[in-house]
């Protein structure tokens, strides 16, 4: 077994602030390159280790096999993304929304009859609802990406801080918001930054996220590929995205007391590392191939984390109301 000294909460919090600063500096200098590196190298290891940890925690749900339903929804997302393209731009967002709704059912309801009724009602409600472009953007684009890596990470941190009530924890939660805000208020000096053809081609499948974020923050109009890769508004948003993803991964790896690397069986650790190396090699061979090959795993960790996200917000609400008593 590997030996790791377990860090206390204050040490982890200060390390996290340091990781935020490092991620911030790199995001200012090489935003596209940082994102592509983090997504290809840190991402797969994060998916594998977090899913393993969630499995040990029964995915924070009340049913033993709830993860099967969430996993099946990921299969549908993959199918309608690559095998049989969705017939409308609400099909995949509806699957994601349904996953979030049934995750809430799995967290709060134990009785199987009530669960079944609520899941059916959620399905019918989504099927009958009238949605537009805003729904597609927030559920189909933002929820599994920037909301997952930034908002849910912040909520998970805040939940832990409210339980431990440490000054260093509060500082880390505030630091995350301040640093994210800095990308929109600090005018970076001219770094003669240009996006190479390889980088722009590798990133093209993510471009929709940038376009909608540029529009959401009202940075410029019209918005096209040139806006994303060659303008200051495009760089501002890309810096924020690169920082959010990179720190999301680093935040997870810093939690040695959660992952407990030293307690992971050698066989499990070897399989995890072998799959991780294989994933990274795919990205090196062709970034597009790696992205498509890991698409299911990426979405799987998003769906399986929904119950934890809901639990985090539940804990935050309980803590806030307990302060008022």
Residue spans of the language-model regions?
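Hydrophobic core segments of alpha-helical transmembrane domains in multi-pass membrane proteins
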Residues: 35-45, 92-101, 137-149, 197-198, ...
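Extracellular/periplasmic helix-loop-helix junctions in multi-pass membrane proteins
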Residues: 196, 231-234, 259-265, 279-300
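Membrane-interfacial catalytic/cofactor-binding modules of polytopic membrane enzymes
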Residues: 192-246
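Aromatic-rich transmembrane-lumenal/periplasmic boundary elements in polytopic membrane proteins
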Residues: 168-207
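Transmembrane helix interruption/hinge and helix-loop junction motifs
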Residues: 27-36, 85-89, 129-137, 282-291
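Membrane-interface helix-loop-helix junctions at boundaries between adjacent transmembrane segments
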Residues: 56, 82-169
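N-terminal signal-anchor module of multipass membrane proteins
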Residues: 1-58
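Hydrophobic core of alpha-helical transmembrane segments in multi-pass integral membrane proteins
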Residues: 17-26, 68-82, 96-108, 118-130, ...
């Amino acid at each position: 077994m590997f030996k790791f000294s377990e860090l206390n909460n204050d040490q982890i919090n200060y390390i996290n602030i340091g990781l935020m600063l490092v991620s911030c500096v790199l995001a200012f200098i090489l935003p596209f390159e940082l994102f592509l590196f983090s997504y290809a190298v840190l991402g797969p290891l994060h998916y594998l280790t977090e899913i393993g940890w969630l499995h040990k925690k029964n995915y924070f749900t009340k049913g033993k096999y709830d993860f099967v339903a969430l996993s099946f929804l990921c299969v549908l997302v993959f199918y309608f993304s690559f095998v049989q393209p969705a017939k409308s731009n609400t099909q995949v967002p509806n699957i994601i929304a349904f996953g979030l709704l049934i995750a809430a059912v799995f967290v709060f309801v134990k009785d199987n009859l009530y669960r079944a009724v609520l899941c059916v009602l959620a399905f019918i409600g989504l099927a009958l609802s009238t949605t537009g472009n805003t729904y597609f953007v927030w559920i189909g684009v933002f929820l599994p990406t920037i909301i997952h890596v930034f908002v849910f990470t912040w909520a998970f941190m805040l939940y832990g801080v409210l339980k431990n009530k440490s000054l260093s924890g509060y500082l880390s939660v505030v630091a995350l918001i301040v640093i994210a805000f800095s990308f929109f208020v600090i005018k970076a000096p001219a770094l003669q930054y240009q996006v190479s053809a390889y980088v722009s081609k590798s990133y093209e499948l993510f471009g929709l996220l940038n376009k909608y974020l540029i529009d959401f923050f009202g940075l410029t109009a019209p918005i096209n590929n040139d806006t994303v890769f060659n303008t200051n508004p495009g760089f501002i948003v890309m810096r924020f995205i690169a920082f959010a993803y990179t720190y999301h991964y680093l935040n997870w790896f810093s939690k040695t007391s959660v992952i407990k690397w030293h307690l992971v069986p050698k066989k499990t650790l070897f399989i995890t590392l072998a799959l991780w190396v294989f994933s990274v090699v795919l990205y090196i061979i062709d970034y597009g191939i790696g992205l498509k090959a890991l698409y299911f795993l990426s979405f799987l960790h998003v769906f399986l984390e929904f119950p934890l996200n809901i639990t985090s917000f539940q804990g935050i609400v309980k803590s806030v109301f307990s302060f008022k008593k």
